[in-house]
């Protein structure tokens, strides 16, 4: 009986630990959806609230250099935001520590600059940190997911 209890405990205990991980990951994935919905709806007050108060680090998908730390404001978002709608596809979250979650996903849609609409497709990685009890964006890196390049998409890319 002792061995059955021990085996059951060894199998069950790791599940309890993993559940704590999954909770933070699910919270961040929910915040990620809220963040991009706010960006698409030009709700910059929500966007700014979901970014770190101490500033965020970013890299754009246009091939430019890394951006310096930026403390954003509603006014900055109004001035710099591209129009259009982008959607989050295949988001994955991995909790790195108690207060840091790494996220990666694809973003696709249409963006508009100076009334000119363009297709948009990029890979995104983000680090979310817990500040004052809430998950917020600390860093985001967008890298072009162009069609072609060094890897040609093939059916096996979509296999589980």
Where are these regions (language model features)?
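Sec-dependent N-terminal signal peptides
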Residues: 4-14
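Short, low-complexity N-terminal intrinsically disordered segments enriched in polar/charged residues
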Residues: 15-50, 156-160
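Hydrophobic pocket/interface hotspot
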Residues: 35, 46-48, 55, 70, ...
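Beta-strand elements of well-folded, non-transmembrane domains
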Residues: 40, 109-113, 128
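A mature extracytoplasmic/lumenal domain signature
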Residues: 51, 61-62, 105-109, 124-126, ...
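A short gly/proline-enriched turn/hairpin at secondary-structure junctions
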Residues: 51-66, 77-82
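Surface-exposed, charged secondary-structure patches
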Residues: 71-116
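Short beta-strand edge/turn micro-motifs at domain boundaries
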Residues: 121-151
